[in-house]
Design a protein with these regions (language model features):
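Extracytoplasmic and endomembrane cell-envelope/extracellular-matrix remodeling and assembly machinery
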Residues: 195-211
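Acidic/histidine-rich, metal-coordinating catalytic segments
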Residues: 168-183
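Histidine-centered divalent-metal-coordination microenvironment in nucleic-acid enzymes
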Residues: 97-101, 180, 188-192
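Conserved small/polar residues in nucleotide/adenosyl-binding loops
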Residues: 217-219
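Active-site-adjacent loop/helix surface patches within enzyme catalytic domains
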Residues: 2-171
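Aromatic- and acidic-residue-enriched segments that line the glycan-binding/catalytic groove
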Residues: 117-120, 185-199
Length: 219
């Protein structure tokens, strides 16, 4: 895989699926990579929503749970993924960042013997859920359910992230939760940010993080 003319090109030399979003604006020079979850029920549904002008939001890339890639905007164009955001004294990260959305339901609520997405109302099995606190939670906040990411999805995100870091000499990898704390919680505690960031920044500690899962605590 490579990046050519700010588009992702697959190993067979063909561009990855490209569906252009209207929710973008002018040219920019990216400095950061921002990770998100879609909070939707499918990658296809999230792509369709981000291509709807009514959404007024879109990332540059959506990664499905099967590792599939759909690009919505060239990597040198402003995509409206960050919203009101601040990092290191600078605001409006749409203007200097690339956004990746991973198909993931995010927060889940327990309803009887099922886990339900508050957004899509879709149910998820225990095997796809982890219990955790968000890093921005107040002390004493009880843990809640979070939708797990798939291994192939995380590997696809890593490979794309490595390409983006090299191509654009990006300074850092951040979560939406870092640049809009209190307003956003993605990509959330199910995303292994420490190891992901270490791999992309070329640091020694790239081991996967471990979390309490439902199977371990017998919920």
């Amino acid at each position: 895989m490579k990046i050519q003319n700010h588009r992702l090109i697959a190993d067979d030399g063909k561009p990855v699926s490209y569906v252009e979003t209207p929710n973008k604006s002018g040219v920019m020079t990216p400095e950061f990579l921002i990770m998100h979850y879609t909070a939707g029920s499918s990658a296809e549904g999230s792509v369709a929503w981000m291509c709807n002008p009514a959404a007024k939001a879109a990332a540059h890339l959506v990664i499905g749970r099967d590792g599939s890639l759909t690009q919505l905007a060239a990597f040198n164009r402003v995509a409206w993924h960050a919203g009101k955001s601040v990092w290191a004294g600078r605001s409006g990260l749409n203007g200097f960042s690339i956004g990746i959305e991973l198909d993931n339901a995010g927060k889940l609520e327990r309803s009887g013997n099922r886990w339900i997405s508050a957004v899509s109302k879709r149910a998820y099995p225990d095997d796809d859920v982890m219990m955790a606190n968000h890093k921005n939670d107040r002390s004493g906040t009880p843990p809640i359910g979070w939708h797990e990411y798939s291994e192939v999805q995380l590997e696809a995100a890593t490979q794309v992230g490595l390409l983006l870091m090299k191509k654009y000499s990006l300074k850092d990898v951040l979560g939406h939760e870092d640049i809009a704390p209190g307003r956003k919680t993605d990509p959330g505690p199910a995303f292994p940010m420490a190891s992901f960031r270490a791999r992309l920044l070329g640091r020694a500690d790239d081991t996967m993080e471990h979390y309490i899962t439902l199977s371990l605590i017998h919920i």
